[in-house]
């Protein structure tokens, strides 16, 4: 009898543990999805200034118009400098292309390359929602912060893992560390300057990054005119790359 009771107690404890573990995982996933929606609508347009800062203080700036649809379609158009004007990039899931006027058909690019140089790579510039590319391995909380440990869904994702610090009260990301599969820190992303973009969208307007691989270099992304907008599927095709300016 005692043996049966002990077995039942162990079984009950095991079930409760499994339930708690499952609930914790679901909470982490739900928080990450809320972070994505707090940062931007699923389909939107925006303008960005990207600034590369070298150790000697020299700066190079780019202005981009960007449109996104659903979870995995994004396109960006270079507006300045004049040497880059008219170039456009397309992302469909894990696939990316660069179009250069008067050069010919679009060329394939990778997530770890950078169309602008600097610390931001193509995955940073054409970034999808975090929950599309990553799963939540673990979540903890301390004070006013959640700490999410994220794992890439597949090997084509630029970073094998992320460590994300999220503010509890706003569910906005504050700091994100990006890691290679070896565990090496590739870069750190820091969000700053909360701004009201309208229609209930209140989020950071500045993203800064640095990397131990590029000591002394820094890149900054400034967001403007971020708003929800719907687009036709034909916009996110190779044939449309020369016509992205018509969206503005």
Label every model-predicted segment:
Residues 75-84:
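N-terminal post-signal-peptidase region of extra-cytosolic proteins
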Residues 127, 143-238:
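Gly/Pro-enriched, hydrophobic low-complexity segments
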Residues 44-45, 70:
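Extracellular or lumenal secretory-pathway regions
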Residues 14-18:
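Sec-dependent N-terminal signal peptides of Gram-positive bacterial secreted proteins and lipoproteins
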Residues 20-22:
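N-terminal signal peptide c-region/cleavage motif recognized by signal peptidases
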Residues 25-43, 49-51, 58-60, 83-160, ...:
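Flexible, processing/modification-adjacent segments and terminal tails
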Residues 35, 64-68, 190-198:
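Extended lipid/amphipathic-ligand handling interfaces
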Residues 1-11:
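Bacterial N-terminal signal peptides that target proteins for export
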């Amino acid at each position: 009898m005692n043996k049966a009771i002990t077995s039942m107690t162990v079984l009950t404890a095991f079930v409760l543990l499994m339930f708690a573990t499952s609930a914790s995982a679901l909470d982490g996933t739900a928080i990450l999805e809320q972070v994505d929606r707090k940062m931007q609508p699923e389909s939107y347009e925006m303008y960005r200034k990207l600034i590369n800062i070298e150790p000697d203080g020299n700066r190079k700036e780019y202005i981009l118009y960007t449109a996104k649809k659903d979870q995995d379609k994004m396109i960006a158009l270079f507006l300045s400098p004049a040497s880059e004007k008219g170039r456009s990039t397309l992302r469909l899931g894990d696939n990316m292309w660069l179009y250069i006027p008067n050069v010919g058909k679009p060329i394939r690019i990778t997530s770890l390359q950078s169309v602008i140089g600097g610390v931001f790579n193509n995955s940073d510039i054409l970034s999808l929602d975090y929950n599309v590319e990553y799963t939540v391995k673990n979540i903890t909380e301390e004070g006013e912060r959640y700490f999410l440990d994220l794992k890439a869904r597949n090997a084509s994702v630029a970073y094998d893992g992320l460590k994300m610090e999220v503010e509890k009260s706003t569910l906005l990301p504050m700091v994100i560390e990006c890691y290679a599969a070896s565990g090496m820190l590739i870069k750190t992303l820091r969000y700053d300057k909360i701004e009201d973009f309208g229609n209930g969208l209140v989020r950071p307007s500045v993203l800064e990054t640095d990397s131990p691989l590029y000591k002394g270099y820094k890149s900054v992304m400034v967001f403007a005119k971020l708003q929800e907008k719907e687009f036709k599927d034909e916009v996110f095709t190779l044939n449309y790359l020369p016509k992205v300016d018509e969206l503005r």
